[in-house]
Swiss-Prot record:
SUPFAM superfamilies: FKBP-like (SSF54534), GreA transcript cleavage protein, N-terminal domain (SSF46557)
Family as reported in the entry's similarity comment: Belongs to the GreA/GreB family.
GO molecular function, one term: DNA binding
Any one GO biological process: DNA-templated transcription elongation
Protein name: Transcription elongation factor GreA
Source organism of this protein record: Lactococcus lactis subsp. cremoris (strain MG1363)
Record Pfam families: GreA_GreB, GreA_GreB_N
Keyword list, A-Z: Coiled coil, DNA-binding, Transcription, Transcription regulation
HAMAP family in UniProt: GreA_GreB (MF_00105)
Primary role: Necessary for efficient RNA polymerase transcription elongation past template-encoded arresting sites. The arresting sites in DNA have the property of trapping a certain fraction of elongating RNA polymerases that pass through, resulting in locked ternary complexes. Cleavage of the nascent transcript by cleavage factors such as GreA or GreB allows the resumption of elongation from the new 3'terminus. GreA releases sequences of 2 to 3 nucleotides.
Coiled coil (residue ranges): 2-27
Length: 156
């Protein structure tokens, strides 16, 4: 059985847009650069050609990866999950016990995780601890050194 990629509908749409961009924009651009670099002659010492071929390999690999993620995407449906329960696709806000600063993240599938925009993977240590918990629960979150105790204050 193939691995599934749990994700939100938004994440799937983003992957489809990336795939379209890779196939319709990036792939043709790199093919054109390869043609231009070939016209310079001797390919054995042609750094432009080598760079374009490397980029082409990266683009083709990314296309393959994205196609696989789309093919085996599993869209989450939170309709059957309690409103105050942490689950993939939901936003969770928590506060470290004894502190006042709240932190909020959306739990998403690995394919759409981006910590810089507040989206953390459901496979991350913090998400694994939070998933299934409810507002008011106090949990220990593992850190690289030790752990921190947090209270879930909001789920939406």
């Amino acid at each position: 059985m193939e691995k599934t990629f749990p994700m939100t509908k938004e994440g799937l749409d983003k992957l489809k847009a990336e795939l379209e961009n890779l196939k319709l924009v990036k792939r043709p651009e790199v093919i054109d650069r390869i043609k231009v670099a070939r016209s310079y002659g001797d390919l054995s010492e042609n750094s432009e050609y080598e760079a374009a071929k490397d980029e082409q390999a990266f683009i083709e690999g990314r296309i393959s990866t994205v196609e696989t993620m789309i093919r085996y995407a599993e869209i989450v449906d939170n309709a059957k999950i309690a409103k105050d329960e942490v689950a993939l696709g939901k936003n969770v806000t928590f506060v470290e016990v004894g502190e006042t600063d709240e932190e909020s993240y959306q739990i998403v599938g690995t394919a759409e995780a981006d910590p810089f925009t507040g989206k953390i993977s459901n496979e991350s240590p913090i998400a694994r601890v939070l998933i299934g918990k409810k507002v008011g629960d106090i949990v220990d979150v593992p850190l690289p050194v030790g752990e921190m105790t947090v209270k879930i204050v909001k789920v939406d």
